[in-house]
Design a protein with these regions (language model features):
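A cross-family phosphate/adenosyl-ligand binding-site feature
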Residues: 1-135, 143-207
């Protein structure tokens, strides 16, 4: 099976904070990006708990649902199952330029740090690291244990960007959406995707 080329892979795990991932996907679609998407089964449970979405369980149905929900073009979002080893993200020759794991469980963090490739999500992260592409991990856990911190340090030394979803309040957010946008804006900055979610610090965009 042939797939459309995409520059970004977005993986969602079963950590709380799935709104960050859904908002990020919306922004990537709005920016015209093609996106590979991997959603773990625990992430599907979290989506059901934290949102009103009725996400189907089959990857093809999930892909159509997200395409319709986010008003994306056909083929702009491509969803892969955890055992879909023919997906481009499973090989260095088809690796995207960047991958974001958002939110990222500490279990997934551990597997990536140790080079495990037990499913497509872990393999995709392994490929991105070995190909020297950009890997952004958004670990949603509190507090972090020594093991968590050791894994983060190990991954940071490999070149991964560790980005806990810690919002800033100096711009005085008024809604939950404002807080979500702060985190998503920082992810987009590291993906070199232009956005208007937040003003740039110290820059007058009206001048």
């Amino acid at each position: 099976m042939k797939y459309k080329s995409a520059n970004i892979c977005l993986a969602m795990t079963g950590a709380s904070g799935i709104q960050y991932a859904l908002r990020l996907l919306q922004c990537l679609v709005d920016a015209g990006e093609n996106v590979y998407v991997i959603i773990s089964q625990p992430a599907q449970i979290v989506i059901d708990m934290e949102t009103d979405l009725q996400l189907p369980s089959r990857p093809n149905d999930m892909q159509q649902y997200l395409t319709d929900y986010l008003n994306a073009k056909e083929g702009q979002i491509q969803v892969f199952g955890k055992d879909q080893w023919t997906a481009p993200v499973a090989s260095g020759s088809g690796a995207p330029n960047a991958m974001v794991v958002c939110p990222c469980t500490t279990g997934t963090l551990s597997s990536i740090a140790c080079g495990s490739s037990n499913n497509l999500m872990e393999r995709a992260a392994d490929v991105v690291l070995k190909e020297r592409k950009k890997l952004i991990l958004v670990p949603r856990e509190m507090p972090f244990s020594e093991i968590h911190l050791e894994h983060m340090l190990k991954l940071a030394r490999m070149g991964a960007v560790i980005m806990p979803p810690n919002p800033g309040f100096y711009y005085r957010p008024k809604t939950i959406e404002d807080i979500i946008d702060f985190v998503v804006a920082r992810i987009l900055d590291h993906l070199d995707i232009k956005h208007e979610l937040l003003p740039q610090w110290g820059i007058d965009n009206n001048s």
